[in-house]
């Protein structure tokens, strides 16, 4: 078992997240707030990636993705 997340895995999911964030828009104030939070976690991911803290980078990416999917499922973003 390894305790490291491969950099390539973080980059892969960050790229997918970037595409997703570029393709959605808010339908409400709640949706706009959700997107702002998702973008903040995306930015955190980039920061931790530069710092080579792959665990925190991946965690921030996952949080961002979860916010986007939740807002999408609630109909707050399209």
Question: Which residue ranges define each predicted feature?
Answer:
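Conserved small-residue packing positions in alpha-helical repeats and bundles
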Residues: 38, 43-45
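Amphipathic, heptad-repeat alpha-helical segments
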Residues: 1-35
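Short, charge-rich amphipathic alpha-helical segments embedded
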Residues: 65-78
């Amino acid at each position: 078992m390894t305790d490291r997340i491969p950099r390539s895995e973080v980059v892969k999911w960050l790229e997918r997240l970037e595409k997703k964030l570029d393709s959605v828009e808010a339908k409400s104030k709640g949706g706009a707030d959700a997107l702002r939070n998702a973008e903040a976690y995306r930015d955190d991911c980039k920061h931790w990636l530069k710092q080579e803290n792959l665990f925190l980078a991946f965690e921030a990416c996952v949080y961002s993705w979860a916010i986007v999917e939740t807002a999408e499922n609630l109909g707050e973003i399209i």
